[in-house]
């Protein structure tokens, strides 16, 4: 069969074994749109129509199809038939050699063989023939019909229908496990991986695995240190767009409107190439970002200075501190949290999952921030510096506790006595004294202690430094070594005053002080004097412990830290501007007041009578440092970069 293509029809000839030449002219397939019912004989026009979206129009009336058989033969034709059929008719029967046409293709069933050559011209469409419609332009984009929405798509009505579910709130796809609903089926499939634990997308560099490809792409930027999202106002760059969106809120609205524009003086191609990796802000996004940059959300509770530019969600999370709302509850220990991410971190305590591991040792942490703090131990990095003394710490919480040494803030107070502490762990240990509980038991004897430190001291004194030859027990290794010399056979060093002998000249010099009347080591608090510095240190520790702490004195025989020493902690004189409205306690720093208020919410209102209030002014006595402003003590605990 020789076929040629001319326009939208196909013609050709076929030699039938009976000697009859059949000329066949067929119309191409007609494609019908399933939404608007338009007919297309051109496949390219049909594809362009589906991609650009279709408009619901009235389906044109289909004209009846006409099939005409024209016989051209050398001898008189036996029969010439002209048949008019409707578009619903698909079966054709002729008296000449019979042809059955199915779906635009032809077959022939000869009924008889003859020598006469007959040429039959057949013109038959496979479907209803209509006027060829004009294909919509391929560049046509559908716009959202909701006012104020600038969404446009060139991917047809299905994509537009998915977008309209955002406005209508339609979420037909529901999770069978947790009941969460989604507007798109692919979102539901990705969500189901949270329940099944399937993470098909794995990192080739480390053990990271993700449930979707976008999370893996974000993770790969950590290894490559790629930061494609750049701020057009400052040198800031981030690995994902959400971080850049949050960063843009820190800029004011005026800076956004003036600086986010395309740089002047650059060609169009060069300017577009320069802005390619950055986030392109639409007019609506600029207005929304400018509004967020202008508006600051303040806490409405009196005395709270919390401010945020990150929207109402951030403010709602903060308000839970005041309201005490903790909607997220642990299933194992019934502990409640105000934020879901805190509950997720807490759950790792029960599951023992520690995904963040140190590459220098065997340490593993449940969160990345704990791992960063641990890595500073290896690098000995101390970015948090005190502005009043040379003290530096590895994390902000240590610096916060250290600043209370300057200010004298003790926000953690005992409800049963007047004891006050700088950190909560000290208060917890103190409360065991009132309860009479002794949870720490010695494994060598029946002694029980209220604190773990007391148990360690007991084991060190009673069960560690024992003499192998007698029942002697020393407090430390030095006592045991000194005693062990008594069991040695050779004592070359002998005292000229008595029968004392030893093997060490230094021990003999110490012994010689027994015979002399000079007592050079004297106590500053009483008339006690001694010949040995260790005896004076024991005396001060037992009798004058509180007085030594008040005056910040070093043990006798050791040089105390100078004014510029790393352990020098001067007190400061400043007004206690942050006062508690429930018990009258006042503090220098706001964080101390927050810790104090948390005690009220934890213990209840019926225990406020036992609170010990602070004086309204600064420390009256013992001022060792200069006058310090409150602003200097309220400085944010940001790491210092001048290490």
From Swiss-Prot:
Keywords: Developmental protein, DNA-binding, Metal-binding, Nucleus, Repeat, Transcription, Transcription regulation, Zinc, Zinc-finger. Zn(2+) 1 binds at residues 495, 498, 511, 515. Residues 538-552 have a biased composition (Basic and acidic residues). It holds the Pfam family zf-C2H2. It comes from the Eukaryota. The keyword Transcription regulation applies. Zn(2+) 2 binds at residues 523, 526, 539, 544. Residues 538-571 are annotated as: Disordered. Transmembrane segments: none annotated. It is found in: Nucleus. GO terms for molecular function: DNA binding; zinc ion binding. GO terms for biological process: mesenchymal cell differentiation; positive regulation of mRNA splicing, via spliceosome. A zinc finger (C2H2-type) spans 173-195, 201-223, 229-251, 297-322, 328-350, 356-378, 384-406, 412-434, 440-463, 465-487, 493-515, 578-600. GO terms for cellular component: nucleus. Widely expressed. Expressed in the brain, spleen, liver, and heart. May be involved in the regulation of mesenchymal cell differentiation through transactivation of NOTCH1 target genes. Belongs to the krueppel C2H2-type zinc-finger protein family. PANTHER family: GASTRULA ZINC FINGER PROTEIN XLCGF49.1-LIKE-RELATED, ZINC FINGER PROTEIN 200. Interacts with NOTCH1. This is Zinc finger protein 64. It comes from Mus musculus (Mouse).
């Amino acid at each position: 069969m020789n076929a040629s293509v001319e326009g939208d029809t196909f013609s050709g000839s076929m030699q039938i074994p009976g000697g009859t030449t059949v000329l066949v002219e067929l119309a191409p397939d007609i494609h019908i749109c399933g939404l608007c019912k338009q007919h297309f004989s051109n496949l390219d026009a049909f594809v362009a129509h589906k991609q650009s979206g279709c408009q619901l129009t009235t389906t044109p009336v289909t004209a009846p199809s006409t099939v005409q058989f024209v016989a051209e033969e050398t001898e008189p034709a036996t029969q010439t038939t002209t048949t008019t059929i409707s578009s619903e008719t698909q079966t054709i029967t002729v008296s000449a050699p019979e042809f059955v046409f199915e779906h635009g293709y032809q077959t022939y069933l000869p009924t008889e063989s003859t020598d006469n050559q007959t040429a039959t011209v057949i013109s038959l469409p496979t479907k209803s023939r209509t006027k060829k419609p004009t294909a919509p332009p391929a560049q046509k984009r559908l716009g959202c019909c909701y006012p104020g929405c600038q969404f446009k798509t060139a991917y047809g009505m299905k994509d537009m229908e998915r977008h309209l579910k955002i406005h209508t709130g339609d979420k037909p796809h529901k999770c069978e496990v947790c009941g969460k609903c989604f507007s798109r089926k692919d979102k539901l499939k990705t969500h189901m991986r949270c329940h099944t634990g399937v993470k098909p997308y794995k990192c080739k560099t480390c053990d990271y695995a993700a449930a979707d490809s976008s999370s893996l792409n974000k993770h790969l930027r950590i290894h490559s240190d790629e930061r494609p999202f750049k701020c057009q106002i400052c040198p800031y760059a981030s690995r994902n767009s959400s971080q850049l969106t949050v960063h843009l809120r820190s800029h004011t609205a005026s800076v956004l409107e003036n600086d986010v524009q395309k740089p002047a003086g650059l060609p169009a191609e060069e300017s577009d190439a320069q802005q390619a990796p950055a986030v392109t802000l639409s007019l609506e996004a600029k207005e929304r970002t400018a509004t967020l940059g202008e508006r600051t959300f303040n806490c409405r509770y009196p005395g709270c200075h919390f401010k945020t530019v990150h929207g109402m969600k951030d403010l709602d999370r903060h308000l839970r501190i005041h309201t005490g709302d903790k909607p997220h509850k642990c299933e194992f220990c019934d502990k409640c949290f105000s934020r879901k991410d805190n509950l997720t971190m807490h759950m790792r305590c029960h599951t023992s999952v520690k995904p963040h591991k140190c590459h220098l040792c065997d340490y593993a942490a449940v969160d990345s921030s704990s791992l960063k703090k641990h890595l500073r131990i290896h690098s000995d990095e101390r970015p948090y510096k005190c502005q009043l003394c040379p003290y530096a710490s590895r994390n902000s919480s240590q610096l916060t506790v250290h600043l209370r040494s300057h200010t004298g803030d003790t926000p953690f107070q005992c409800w049963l006595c007047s004891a006050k502490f700088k950190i909560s762990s000290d208060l917890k240990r103190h409360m065991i004294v009132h309860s009479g509980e002794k949870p720490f038991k010695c494994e060598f004897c029946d002694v029980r202690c209220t604190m773990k430190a007391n148990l360690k001291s007991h084991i060190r004194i009673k069960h560690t430094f024992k003499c192998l030859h007698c029942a002697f027990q020393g407090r430390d290794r030095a006592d045991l070594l000194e005693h062990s010399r008594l069991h040695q056979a050779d004592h070359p060093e002998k005292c000229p005053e008595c029968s004392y002998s030893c093997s060490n000249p230094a021990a003999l010099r110490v012994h010689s002080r027994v015979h002399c009347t000079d007592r050079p080591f004297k106590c500053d608090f009483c008339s006690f004097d001694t010949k040995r510095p260790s005896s004076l240190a024991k005396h001060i520790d037992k009798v004058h412990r509180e007085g030594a702490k008040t005056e910040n004195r070093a043990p006798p025989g050791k040089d105390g830290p100078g004014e510029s020493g790393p352990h020098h902690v001067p007190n400061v004189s400043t007004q206690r501007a942050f006062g508690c409205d429930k018990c009258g306690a006042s503090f220098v720093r706001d964080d101390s007041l927050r810790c104090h208020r948390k005690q009220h919410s934890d213990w209840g209102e019926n225990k406020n009578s036992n609170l010990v209030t602070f004086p309204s002014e600064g420390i009256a006595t013992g001022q060792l440092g200069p006058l310090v402003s409150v602003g200097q003590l309220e400085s944010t605990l940001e790491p210092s970069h001048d290490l």
